[in-house]
């Protein structure tokens, strides 16, 4: 695993390569981007979700991943999420001057999801509200609904953030997942955004 990063005010960027016997992953991000993405995970629906994440968070991101998808896409999906979490943590640096908290409620037709993010340094995920059986649906031919929670678990753990994700409504499995990714994107965008009124670390402890 190799990583590089810069958290200077003008360049909150990071890049990481992660290789295991199950997958090979490269993720590069720029937190102060415009939502430009170059995504290829070999899992088309996941590519679609990560592209939406970039678009609505305004994070520029490159993802290149290959893995044992002939067995199951789980390894590749989770390893990409782990690597994204790591580069997010690296790009944030000491978190000085950020808003820290972000919240968004996002619809996609009949589906509605709410996400609340705290860039706290303490990884925690609360994930609920999906309709019964959502985890068993196969979306796009490869992506099972249960992977949604795994993705958010991996991101929160490795980025060191707290995420409360709640599905308020939804019927179509695709829409339910996409609403969650878009809500997370908007909440993350707000949380990592620089706040010109904040001096130093946004915590009474002096560290995050």
From Swiss-Prot:
Q: Which molecular-function annotations from GO does this UniProt entry contain?
A: imidazoleglycerol-phosphate dehydratase activity
Tell me, in one coarse class, where this protein mainly resides.
cytoplasm
The record's top EC class is lyase
Q: Which GO terms describe its biological process?
A: L-histidine biosynthetic process
The cellular location(s) given in this protein's UniProt record come to: Cytoplasm
Q: What Pfam families does the database record attribute to this sequence? A: IGPD
The biological pathway it contributes to is: Amino-acid biosynthesis; L-histidine biosynthesis; L-histidine from 5-phospho-alpha-D-ribose 1-diphosphate: step 6/9
> Which keywords does the record carry?
Amino-acid biosynthesis, Cytoplasm, Histidine biosynthesis, Lyase
Q: What is one cellular component GO term in this UniProt entry?
A: cytoplasm
Q: Which reaction does it catalyse?
A: D-erythro-1-(imidazol-4-yl)glycerol 3-phosphate = 3-(imidazol-4-yl)-2-oxopropyl phosphate + H2O
Superkingdom of the source species: Bacteria
Q: Which Enzyme Commission numbers does its entry carry? A: 4.2.1.19
Q: Which family does it belong to?
A: Belongs to the imidazoleglycerol-phosphate dehydratase family.
What is the protein name for this chain? Imidazoleglycerol-phosphate dehydratase
Q: What is the lineage of its organism?
A: Bacteria, Bacillati, Actinomycetota, Actinomycetes, Micrococcales
